Swiss-Prot record:
It is found in: Cytoplasm. This is DNA replication and repair protein RecF. ATP binds at G30, N31, N32, G33, S34, G35, K36, T37. One of its GO terms (cellular component) is cytoplasm. It comes from the Bacteria. Keywords: ATP-binding, Cytoplasm, DNA damage, DNA repair, DNA replication, DNA-binding, Nucleotide-binding, SOS response. Pfam families: SMC_N (PF02463). PROSITE patterns: RECF_1, RECF_2. InterPro entries: DNA-binding_RecF, DNA-binding_RecF_CS, P-loop_NTPase, RecF/RecN/SMC_N, RecF_2. Belongs to the RecF family. It comes from Mannheimia succiniciproducens (strain KCTC 0769BP / MBEL55E). One of its GO terms (molecular function) is ATP binding. GO terms for biological process: DNA replication; DNA synthesis involved in DNA repair; double-strand break repair; SOS response. The RecF protein is involved in DNA metabolism; it is required for DNA replication and normal SOS inducibility. RecF binds preferentially to single-stranded, linear DNA. It also seems to bind ATP.
């Protein structure tokens, strides 16, 4: 999978650009604030329907414009798609088009464009709350298990309804029919997560040994309640407690994917540089797992490539990315920061105040 062409209009400080990319490496070079991260953000938005920097739509749309528009041409093997996304300032409405047809969902775009992003802020995958690590697992399942997205959506809808009902009823029999359905979905989603975590864990640990040979990294999945406990029974037993607190305490919404080094949480013992390498290892292992299992290449977006990595580690990451045969977008302040990442075929773009030009 690769983005062959991207048109961006009125996205942050980018008024209008029309760019053609290499199917391998694409370098975005410019000073801080020039717009290189904004281009990565536009690429991410096209593949996720949201920003990785802000949840406020008005901050993404260029200050004096009613909307932003993204158009892309995507290629995979012998297939090609045109995709488009427009976000309105006034009502926040999102329009998604695939091959010129309306009525598509953001999830349709996400399926077409499997993306991994590595940013300085991405350490929340390791030192943030469990929700970041659930999202990591669920990204993989979205691309590996065709029924996961619908089951996940139904699960969250039922949890929301149950939490609302907890504040309105004193009789558990009113909740029991919902809880039976909730328990079924919880077991299915948790089993998918457990199976995926089990399949991915050896690849993560192997990649960690390459990037961080001085450390012994182990991963483990926790489903959100005791492993051998029946979830339907647990919901019944916890009704009074859940009602007192106002929400469902246990369940797949509390799942976690934990990382430890020598028996201790990695966020407590690793330096920021080591955490960044571990984050890179996780993203790479997940992208490579997708390729191995589904024969689909992931697109990698890397912001501030040189940050907190020495030259040896930069070269190691660059070589692993080259070996993946994936499309890669990398930002840097200067070309010198990219000298470890110079494949024979690549494209370099200079970014200045929202203007982007390819360097020959």
């Amino acid at each position: 999978m690769a983005i062959a062409r991207l048109i961006v209009e009125n996205f942050r400080n980018i008024s209008a650009v029309d760019l053609e990319f290499d199917h391998g490496f694409n370098f975005l070079v410019g000073n801080n604030g020039s717009g290189k991260t904004s281009l990565l953000e536009a690429l991410f938005y096209l593949g996720h329907g949201r920003s990785f920097k802000s949840s406020v739509t008005t901050r993404v749309i260029r200050y004096d414009q009613p909307h932003f528009t993204l158009h892309g041409r995507i290629r995979e093997l012998q297939h090609e798609w045109s995709v488009g996304l427009q976000k309105q300032r006034k009502d926040g409405n999102t329009i998604v088009k695939i091959n010129g047809e309306d009525g598509n969902k953001i999830s349709d775009l996400a399926h077409l464009l499997p993306m991994q992003i590595i940013t300085p802020e991405g350490l929340t995958l390791l030192n943030g709350g469990p929700s970041y690590r659930r999202a990591f697992l669920d990204w993989g399942l979205f691309h590996h298990q065709p029924n996961f997205h619908s089951a996940w959506s139904a699960l969250h809808r039922l949890l929301k309804q149950r939490n609302a009902a907890l504040n309105q009823t004193y009789d558990y029999n009113m909740l029991k029919p919902w809880d039976m359905e909730l328990a079924k979905l919880a077991h299915q989603v948790s089993q998918w997560r457990a199976d995926y975590a089990e399949a991915l864990s050896p690849e993560i640990e192997q990649t960690c040994r390459l990037f961080l040979p001085e450390l012994d990294i182990h991963v483990s999945f926790h489903q959100g309640w005791e492993k051998d406990t029946d979830y339907a029974q647990l919901l019944t037993e916890n009704f009074e407690r859940d009602k007192a607190i106002g929400y469902t305490v246990s369940g797949p919404q509390k799942a976690d994917f934990r990382f430890k080094s020598n028996g201790l949480p990695v966020e407590d013992v690793l330096s920021r540089g080591q955490l960044k390498l571990l984050m890179c290892a996780l993203r790479l292992a997940q992208g490579e797992h997708l390729m191995a299992q589904k024969n689909r290449h992931c697109i990698f977006l890397i912001d501030d490539f040189a940050s907190e990595l020495d030259e040896t580690k930069r070269a190691l990451l660059a070589q692993r990315l080259q070996n993946s045969n994936s499309q890669v977008f990398v930002t840097a302040i200067s070309p010198e920061q990219l000298k470890q990442m110079q494949p024979e075929k690549h494209r370099t773009f200079q970014v200045v105040n929202g203007q982007i030009e390819q360097l020959l």
